[in-house]
Amino acid sequence: MPLASDVKQKIMSDYATVERDTGSPEVQVAMLTRRISDLTEHLKVHKHDHHSRRGLLLLVGRRRRLLNYLAKTDINRYRALIERLGLRR
């Protein structure tokens, strides 16, 4: 399920490196993390929703690839981001 535009704006303003930043890895990972948490809550209620489970796995893979890219290019930004989002690595 897509995020509401006000939620997207809030995430962008919190994680943007410059104003109107939508493409930086930090913003993308933060948005994916929000979608992943929403889908996880949905799947706790609807255990047999396999279509959404596959979508969740795709989102987790996309987030993992972005985090790997960030770790390779700038380890300090990577560490700060996972600390801020509360992700374990």
From Swiss-Prot:
A Pfam family per the record: Ribosomal_S15
User: InterPro entries per the record?
Assistant: Ribosomal_uS15, Ribosomal_uS15_bac-type, uS15_NS1_RNA-bd_sf
Lineage here is: Bacteria, Bacillati, Actinomycetota, Actinomycetes, Frankiales
Cystine pairings recorded for this chain: none
Gene Ontology CC annotations of this record: cytosolic small ribosomal subunit
Regarding protein family, the annotation reads: Belongs to the universal ribosomal protein uS15 family.
State the UniProt keywords alphabetically: Ribonucleoprotein, Ribosomal protein, RNA-binding, rRNA-binding
Tell me, what does this protein do in biology? Answer: One of the primary rRNA binding proteins, it binds directly to 16S rRNA where it helps nucleate assembly of the platform of the 30S subunit by binding and bridging several RNA helices of the 16S rRNA. Forms an intersubunit bridge (bridge B4) with the 23S rRNA of the 50S subunit in the ribosome.
Q: How does it assemble?
A: Part of the 30S ribosomal subunit. Forms a bridge to the 50S subunit in the 70S ribosome, contacting the 23S rRNA.
**By its UniProt entry, which SUPFAM superfamilies does this protein fall under?**
S15/NS1 RNA-binding domain (SSF47060)
Tell me if rRNA-binding is a UniProt keyword of this record: yes
Share an example GO biological-process annotation for this protein: translation
Record PROSITE patterns = RIBOSOMAL_S15
User: Is Ribonucleoprotein one of the keywords UniProt gives this record?
Assistant: yes
Protein name per its UniProtKB record: Small ribosomal subunit protein uS15
GO MF, one term, reads: structural constituent of ribosome
